[in-house]
């Protein structure tokens, strides 16, 4: 089984050397070691030194210096919308207070399905809709930045 041994962000790897791709949901895009199935049906071992938060368009370098393209897979999600940005910010605060993964933009918030949270959001007079899309939530204030590795204190 071939091994994927390093990761590069979208735009920082030679896409012309892509020989195949993998479609991964959010959980599978944040792994260190994992068995992947490529679009062509090949099993590849993801074997990175550390877990990396991969995003759509990133690349995985194989041992032979060829590359796999990472595609964010479609997931069942809840789309939250409101009538104005202030109301959406208020809903975002409540979601953040519960430490939920959320993809936030100017017009909507995407979260994973959770009937308790859905009830809370409706109780805040926001609208919900079930959608199927790629999920790329915010990292949060204390995440490992993709461009600066964390040093470990021993």
Residue spans for each PLM region:
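Helix-rich terminal scaffold detector
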Residues: 1-18, 40, 111-154
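Short, solvent-exposed interaction modules
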Residues: 86, 90-97
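A common structural junction motif
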Residues: 96-99, 103, 125-130
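Intrinsically disordered, low-complexity, positively charged segments
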Residues: 1-51
């Amino acid at each position: 089984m071939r091994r994927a041994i390093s990761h590069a962000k979208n735009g920082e790897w030679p896409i012309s050397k892509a020989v195949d791709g993998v479609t991964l949901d959010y959980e599978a895009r944040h792994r260190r070691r994992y068995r992947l199935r490529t679009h062509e049906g090949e099993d590849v071992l993801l074997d990175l030194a550390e877990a990396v938060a991969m995003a759509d368009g990133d690349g995985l370098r194989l041992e032979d210096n060829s590359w796999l393209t990472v595609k964010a897979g479609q997931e069942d999600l809840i789309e939250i919308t409101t009538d104005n940005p202030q109301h959406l910010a208020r809903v975002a605060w409540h979601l953040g207070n519960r430490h939920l993964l959320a993809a936030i933009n100017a017009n909507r918030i995407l979260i994973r399905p959770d009937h308790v949270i859905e009830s809370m959001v409706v109780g805040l007079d926001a609208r919900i809709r079930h959608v199927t899309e790629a999920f790329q939530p915010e990292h949060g204030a204390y995440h490992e930045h993709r461009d600066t590795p964390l040093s470990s204190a021993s």
